[in-house]
């Protein structure tokens, strides 16, 4: 009996370890019920307001489309996403979609999905793999273009400056597609004029708390900061707290340009604490569900689908805020 009790306890612990795998909809152990398309979605985490809006869009759109959604939160850990994807393969879902924590290290698990004849859709973030057959399509933003837009705003804003323009950069999650590409696009633009210099650059992990912490360190180590470039609004909002605590005025003493355009960021822009925001649209749910149905039916889809996005200054932020969904 003691041996049996130990086995039951081990089984219960293993089940608890999979608590991140949460079925939404009718659920169940089979890949689908009543012929419904089943989607296994491995979300990167809940690190920001953008990500929360993205998750909500996916969950609501799946319900509206009649798609059975099995959803997991990887808590920003690649190993959790890989475990979730393997679980979806075992459950024989019709389609797998995920937003990769980082760009590399996916080939093995995606080959497992391919061998199981389960199509994969990349959402929001791309992967770095020479084998493009491992996924059907990518749905999301052009992160390099977002970085370029931020750089173009900066060069226009400081075009008449005669001295060196000192820039600090809050990067996203190390190794992630948006962090790599937003940095690349921004750097390409400012490289055209040597007066623009990034004097400090560090990851803020896309979170408000880390953005504040890193900005505090920048302020202590750098006597003159002209501009903050934040890879997302949440880090910019954390940085604003640090700037104000240091007795400086965000948006004036230190100009701020960020990416996302979530509601809190837009409010800071309307209040003059952020100077410019490049939009990254999180509401991918409707487009994703359309793609899920198509690939489940064996239809051909484009290899890359980019979302339409804009930019905001203070006036346009004030106009957009009343109807902002996220």
Model-predicted regions and their roles:
Residues 7-16:
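Sec-dependent N-terminal signal peptides
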Residues 19-23:
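C-terminal motif of bacterial Sec signal peptides marking the signal peptidase cleavage site
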Residues 2-7, 24-326:
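A residue-level marker of the well-folded mature domains of exported/periplasmic proteins
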